[in-house]
From Swiss-Prot:
PANTHER family according to UniProt: MAS-RELATED G-PROTEIN COUPLED RECEPTOR (PTHR11334), PROTO-ONCOGENE MAS (PTHR11334:SF61)
GO molecular function annotation: angiotensin receptor activity; angiotensin type II receptor activity; G protein-coupled receptor activity; peptide binding
Bilayer topology term: Multi-pass membrane protein
Protein species of origin: Homo sapiens
Stated name of the protein: Proto-oncogene Mas
Transmembrane feature ranges: 37-61, 66-86, 105-128, 150-172, 186-206, 225-245, 264-284
Gene: MAS1
InterPro entries named in the record: GPCR_Rhodpsn, GPCR_Rhodpsn_7TM, MRGPCRFAMILY, Proto-oncogene_Mas
Amino acid sequence: MDGSNVTSFVVEEPTNISTGRNASVGNAHRQIPIVHWVIMSISPVGFVENGILLWFLCFRMRRNPFTVYITHLSIADISLLFCIFILSIDYALDYELSSGHYYTIVTLSVTFLFGYNTGLYLLTAISVERCLSVLYPIWYRCHRPKYQSALVCALLWALSCLVTTMEYVMCIDREEESHSRNDCRAVIIFIAILSFLVFTPLMLVSSTILVVKIRKNTWASHSSKLYIVIMVTIIIFLIFAMPMRLLYLLYYEYWSTFGNLHHISLLFSTINSSANPFIYFFVGSSKKKRFKESLKVVLTRAFKDEMQPRRQKDNCNTVTVETVV
């Protein structure tokens, strides 16, 4: 894949820096697409939102299995938004910022993909675990391992690191010439299987089961806000973030056809990462007291887990949980 053919700035930027700036000498006054100005406007707002959310989750709120996942998801979103903001500014300035700082921009580009991949994996884990809590409530409340959320998050971060490294080394890095186009194609197939045949179906199936079970049972209504948070977050991700992964995979093979669409997909991904704190706020806030309650109260309500696992053995022996049929 010839580096000069790459037009998506997240993939293109390391290439342009490594191959020199000769191509941009006569293009100093090029017009910047409006999509990049929108990205530069949205990404810092989303970065601040997720930063505030992360601070509350880490220092002001009591943790439960669900908030552990949300904390890690917020970190992934912060990483993505920070990188896309810096890269979009560099693109708008015709790579003036990155001149002479090749490895810094490489790190930002890889971190962007890293945050994106992690977001997909974490949302799948959230959906699957919530589905299990509805299907097997007694196990969830009494026998679920105490540090399961933290362990799952650690494994998903490691998987994301592996996938991102493979994608960068085999398909993006122009410095490494020992890898053939077939190597990149093999990585594309692996990522496609992982994303579209493993994680996305798991997310969809578990979310569907969750919706069906909740609609059939009124006992879960008291914690409906948590389920709404999960479902809306997943829907927004599927609409705004998944197209970027599909286009990236197609882009490596058919750059001339899908290159221009990448700018739109990057904007959508930025919107997705910026939207999550808004979702938590509007779902958790009371309609009559919106903008009047403290953020801690709103977030606590949004993330309240009525089925939170119980650690005391006596409680588990005496608790009666209605089985979902």
